[in-house]
Amino acid sequence: MGTHEYEDDPRNETVLISVNGKLLPRSEAMVSVFDAGFLLGDGVWESFRLHEGKLVFIEDHIDRLFRGASEISLDPGKSRNQIMAEINRVISANQMHDQVHLRLIILGA
């Protein structure tokens, strides 16, 4: 399988996604085409795994996210603790525990 391919996961059909703090079904989780992140590529993201209830290397991922945001003068808009609370809220709302891939995206406004 190539790097741009993925195996379909039936859990994705009912997944809730946080967009600006609102938990939305996948079909409603959208970003405006006028968003700076979409128009200008103004944003940062990190991808991480949930394995046996643990977020693997989460501190490293959050550090890298904040460094990347700083490098492009992007204010994440939330503290590390607030971001972690939102990640945990998404995990809880989706009853996630293992073999989960999460992506955190922060876009410019």
Language-model segments: residues:
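Conserved alpha/beta cores of soluble small-molecule-handling proteins
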Residues: 1-109
